[in-house]
């Protein structure tokens, strides 16, 4: 009987499987398997206890009806568990885990389930016998109901005992089979006694617990059956939720990794592609990926409870609300508004913007006289006033005034011409007459300063500025040059000798002009007859007056009219230029001419009476200058007694030479008079050989300290009674050749003398020679 009572509850269900097996179907994972095995052991113990109690009730005849009712209720519980398991079959992962657990449970429960199947028939027979006794014992029914309530309460409290059951799982697995064997071997009598004692204690405890449970059940909306249904799936749901959450976290991590990889790829694509269309396509792809992820998460979370679903939804909503902030966002970025800032506009230079409009006339820079006068003028006030009249009150730098004025080519009237002309006239009328005359001079407008009125000047200026043009063909440059030529002094030969050094600089600049005038004078010399003679007489008078004035200044008495030889203007200009050329050549010779001067001085002393020399006054002036120079050079160089004795020797012959020409003045007068009377007659010109012989004779008796090229020409003219101005160039060459010959001879003689003299004396003589050269140049 004991074996039959323990096997009553392990009744097969409608599907042919035990109820113990079906409760584990809803549990997934190793933990669920362990909990299920622990529960089965406890239930088996409780069923054994209830079996003993039922044996006592069988004696009374009413116990089997309660057991049948409990069996029906267990069947209902198993059916409900099947439904829950059917819902969970949708999850492939949970099913796999359940299959693994089922295999393990089958291995552990083979002995128990096998015993249960063999004894099902015995249980049915005992139930039928018990049904007959239930009608006789109504009190037993009440006891059965109370026991059933206890069992249900025990099942409800199964969750509370779950923690303790988990601890006992490891040790209970192996003990299940042993306990089943012990139950079979225990005597029925011993079991009945032990069960009675236990049942009495348990009944008292169960009554107390049932009272508290009944109060709880009253407050609940559903029955105890609903509570049992909810309690078990809640535990299962919590476990599944924890697993699902872990799985979701892992999946989210993987998704985040994938998203990070995708973001990196997207960043590379964005760096390469800046177009908005690509950005939009990428954003659409990202949205589709998010939707797919949401769908997958929804599929995964179908087995989850409403709480987990609410959590996931809230998390997803937060993710949607909180925008991502990667380095390069996938979404299209709005265009930034450009910031408008106030910037101070810098005005460009007015000089760069200044523009001169073209007029009807020619630009002032193309009119030569106007351009020349504007360039020579230096007063800025005149140009400022002109600039305001021509271009208005525009500010311009002082350096650019002339440039703008020279670019002016006439007024370009805008609007009414008459009004514009009136404005210009008003501007001119405000200016003084003197300034207006300056404007006329600038623009080369001829105006009579005394007679013309201010109004007439203004009208002329306005007419000219309307259409500028050249008023005259004569150039101002050439006029000024001609005036400068006329201003050069017309002096006689002695005056030219004294002032040749002053005119040397000016004469060098005008060598080209002089050669031109020389050619013209030579060409026209044959054609000129009486007119030239009359001009010569007038010029001679003027020259005589100038000579007298110069002589009075130098302290020399006046001379008669016959003393001064006279030449034309062209000849004098040519002579002065040739003198300057001779002086430059004599400077190059230097020491050569010094020796010649000494020899020629000795020769001239012996031949004073034979050859007539130059007039006395210029000689005295030059001698005084040379004496002064010699004194200065001697004082600077040496103060020895030898030098002083030599100076005295050299000064004595100079004084004698100065006295000799004074005596010969009376002798020269008839010669010059004859030349003046005969010069008008045309005689044959001498040949070159005759000229050479005459030049040699003249050079032998000439004092090189005072003589000049004009003096030699005058002597040649006096000798041949002809003006030799046409042959100046040939005469000049002859004189130069003779001078070089004399210089060479003098050098040879000096070389012989230098051997005899000491080196100190040679240096002094060279110093004297250099002083003599300077005198000749002067």
From Swiss-Prot:
Motif (Nuclear localization signal 3): 618-625
Skewed-composition ranges (Basic and acidic residues): 40-95, 121-153, 165-185, 209-243, 287-296, 303-323, 678-689, 764-778
Name by which UniProt lists this protein: DEK domain-containing chromatin-associated protein 4
Stretches the record annotates as Disordered: 1-334, 475-689, 741-778
Subunit-structure text: Interacts with DEK3.
UniProt GO cellular component terms: mitochondrion; nucleolus; plastid
Residue ranges of the motif Nuclear localization signal 1: 289-296
Biased composition (Basic residues): 621-631
Coiled-coil regions listed in the entry: 191-300, 526-587, 732-766
Localization, UniProt: Nucleus; Nucleus, Nucleolus
Species classification: Eukaryota, Viridiplantae, Streptophyta, Embryophyta, Tracheophyta
Annotated keywords: Chromatin regulator, Coiled coil, DNA-binding, Nucleus, Transcription, Transcription regulation
Ranges spanned by the short sequence motif Nuclear localization signal 2, renumbered to the chain: 489-496
Molecular function terms, GO-annotated: DNA binding
A Pfam family that the UniProt record links to this protein: DEK_C
Any one biological process term the GO annotation gives: chromatin organization
Gene3D superfamilies: Homeodomain-like
Sequence ranges of Low complexity compositional bias: 491-502
PANTHER family: DEK CARBOXY-TERMINAL DOMAIN PROTEIN-RELATED, DEK PROTEIN
Sequence ranges of Polar residues compositional bias: 14-26
Residue ranges constituting the DEK-C domain according to the UniProt record: 685-740
Domain of life: Eukaryota
